[in-house]
């Protein structure tokens, strides 16, 4: 079958307009997966060495000095405390809708990507998002 250049252009345009729109459940699952990856990244706390002269200038109680010089992390302290309420505390849901920020620059995200639903603010940020940050494959 012979295809004219006009028909070829129409077919090409139709293919470009077809986008894979992802349902909210898949978006939520991808968001949770990204948050879990961020939790795993840089899991160890940064250790700051306190100079001896700073500790000797001020009169600090022994308990404070012990905490400052300890190698324990915040997670270790949470594990030690019995009946820790840090992980169980919950705030009531907000009555306001969640604010949307641009995924690229952090400004107000007034537009949303049709593929993944991520917010962006301008055409330039949309181009950057579609080239580098858009999750095109959902599994």
Swiss-Prot record:
The keyword Nucleus applies. This is SWR1 complex subunit vps71. The keyword Zinc-finger applies. The lineage of its organism: Eukaryota, Fungi, Dikarya, Ascomycota, Taphrinomycotina. A zinc finger (HIT-type) spans 102-134. It holds the Pfam family zf-HIT. PANTHER family: ZINC FINGER HIT DOMAIN CONTAINING PROTEIN 1. It comes from Schizosaccharomyces pombe (strain 972 / ATCC 24843) (Fission yeast). Zn(2+) 1 binds at residues 102, 105, 121, 125. Its main location: nucleus. Component of the SWR1 complex which mediates the ATP-dependent exchange of histone H2A for the H2A variant H2A.Z leading to transcriptional regulation of selected genes by chromatin remodeling. One of its GO terms (molecular function) is zinc ion binding. Keywords: Chromatin regulator, Cytoplasm, Metal-binding, Nucleus, Zinc, Zinc-finger. It comes from the Eukaryota. GO terms for biological process: chromatin remodeling; transcription initiation-coupled chromatin remodeling. GO terms for cellular component: cytosol; nucleus; Swr1 complex. Zn(2+) 2 binds at residues 113, 116, 129, 134. Component of the SWR1 chromatin-remodeling complex. It is found in: Nucleus; Cytoplasm.
């Amino acid at each position: 079958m012979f295809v004219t250049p006009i028909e070829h252009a129409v077919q090409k345009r139709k293919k470009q307009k077809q986008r894979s729109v992802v349902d909210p459940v898949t978006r939520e699952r991808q968001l949770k997966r990204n948050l879990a990856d961020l939790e795993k990244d840089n899991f160890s706390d940064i250790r700051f060495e306190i100079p001896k002269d700073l500790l000797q200038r001020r009169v600090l109680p022994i308990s404070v000095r012990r905490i400052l010089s300890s190698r324990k992390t915040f997670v270790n302290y949470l594990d030690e405390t019995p009946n820790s309420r840090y992980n169980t505390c919950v705030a009531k849901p907000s009555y306001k809708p969640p604010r949307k920020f641009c995924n690229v620059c952090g400004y107000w995200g007034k537009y949303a990507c049709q593929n993944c639903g991520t917010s962006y603010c301008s055409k330039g940020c949309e181009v950057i998002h579609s080239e580098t940050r858009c999750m095109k494959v959902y599994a």
